[in-house]
């Protein structure tokens, strides 16, 4: 055990929570790096995509985020727990500072709809990439049913391209009328 004066102490840092922020300090897309003896830039790299094409749904957090259990395509792969966000859609949020009662009700309805379709079932993933929070981003299929499109068609979701979200003033009104 180190004596107190030799231990790392967050109290010496002006803003100790700054070490947990997501700011990209020191990031430059035109800076060169050496990787395995090769001089590269950010643009020479590609975003990682999980080598996965499906799994069994073990949790439905909300209508656009599920958790699957799956192995990776190599011998003796352990069974991984992976968070998957449905590509191209946004659904009502269950939690958050600005979540209204209307949105909570709509969110639970949408989550229950998805849960009844996919929970404990095998789903297929297509167009697999990663999204900004590290989750898998994919088109989800149950048999031949494209879940992402079904949620849009049945008005449990709105289109979302990864940028600024445009959500309905009332999710329940949107579900009934289609008016955003």
What are these regions (language model features)?
Residues 3-180:
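Small beta-barrel nucleic-acid-binding modules, primarily SNase/OB-fold domains
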């Amino acid at each position: 055990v180190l004596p107190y004066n030799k231990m790392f102490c967050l109290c010496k840092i002006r803003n100790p929570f700054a070490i947990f922020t997501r700011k990209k300090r020191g990031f430059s897309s035109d800076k060169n790096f050496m990787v395995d003896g090769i001089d590269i830039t950010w643009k020479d790299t590609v975003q990682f995509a999980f080598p996965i094409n499906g799994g069994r749904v073990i949790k439905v957090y909300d209508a656009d985020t599920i958790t699957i259990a799956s192995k990776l395509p190599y011998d003796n792969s352990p069974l991984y727990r992976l968070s998957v966000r449905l590509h191209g859609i946004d659904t009502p949020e269950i939690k958050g500072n600005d979540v209204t009662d209307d949105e909570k009700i709509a969110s639970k309805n949408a989550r229950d709809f998805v849960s009844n379709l996919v929970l404990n079932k095998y789903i297929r993933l297509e167009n697999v990439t990663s999204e900004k929070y590290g989750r898998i981003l994919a088109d989800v299929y149950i048999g031949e049913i494209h879940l992402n499109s079904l949620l849009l068609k049945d008005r449990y979701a709105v289109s979302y391209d990864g940028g600024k979200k445009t959500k309905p003033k009332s999710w329940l009104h949107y579900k009934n009328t289609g008016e955003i």
